[in-house]
Amino acid sequence: MGSKTLPAPVPIHPSLQLTNYSFLQAFNGLPVPAEHMPNLYGFSALHAVHLHQWTLGYPTLHLPRSSFSKVPGVSSLVDSRFQIPTFPLFPHMIHPKQESPNLSNKTKPRFDFANLALAATQEDHCKLGQMDDQGSPPTIGGLLDVTKLTPEKKPTRGRLPSKTKKEFVCKFCGRHFTKSYNLLIHERTHTDERPYTCDICHKAFRRQDHLRDHRYIHSKEKPFKCQECGKGFCQSRTLAVHKTLHTQVKELKPSKIKC
């Protein structure tokens, strides 16, 4: 029995007729000028992008469009029943960029290092202005440059700027303090105010912790003890003065031995 060959099914989407490999392979048999070969590779790459957009459901890019009929030999590869879809293309892929003679004659101004930041910002604006004057559609690089954050809108990282510390000034002597409590205690030296009074001997103090240390005098408890000699004290500052005596004695002993 002879095998019957079935006709090839008609593709659902016209762009599925062409693949990167088959498209370029078909062009090997056609007389295509050498200058149009990069355009064919660009068409193949953009065809793959269009295929992914169609299959995945992504919206198409709203960019300047041009037909592939300008590329020689494209219309002969596609069946006449299907219409060649238009893909987003950039003009430089089909037509080479032509430099205007006016721009080539202009000389670039000398860079001024004194105004570095100003010159950098002006250079970007000049580039955008030149593109608008030429009338050429914006490229992807130009669109990305426009969407970049300006230095003013960049999010700040790291610590916030430190707040200025408040200064509390004594109205009697003009001394500065960083805390209001320290200023309050200092001003009591000028006014001789002693709001904390002992209940036993009625001695008054400027600070509450001084009154607390004073109360140990009336009791037998001496919580502050010297580690050198074991002597106890009622106040911490009295113990600190006592420790200086031990350090002075240690400094005098080596000097006596040398003599």
UniProtKB/Swiss-Prot annotation:
Superkingdom as given in the UniProt entry: Eukaryota
Keyword tags: Developmental protein, Metal-binding, Nucleus, Repeat, Repressor, Transcription, Transcription regulation, Zinc, Zinc-finger
One GO molecular-function entry: zinc ion binding
UniProt entry tagged with the keyword RNA-binding: no
UniProt-listed SUPFAM superfamilies: beta-beta-alpha zinc fingers (SSF57667)
Gene Ontology CC entries for this record: nucleus
Deletion phenotype: Embryos show a down-regulation of early pronephric markers lhx1/lim1 and pax8, and disruption of pronephric development.
Pfam families assigned to the protein according to its UniProt record, in alphabetical order: zf-C2H2
Role, per record: Transcriptional repressor. Required for pronephric kidney development.
The protein's name: Protein odd-skipped-related 1
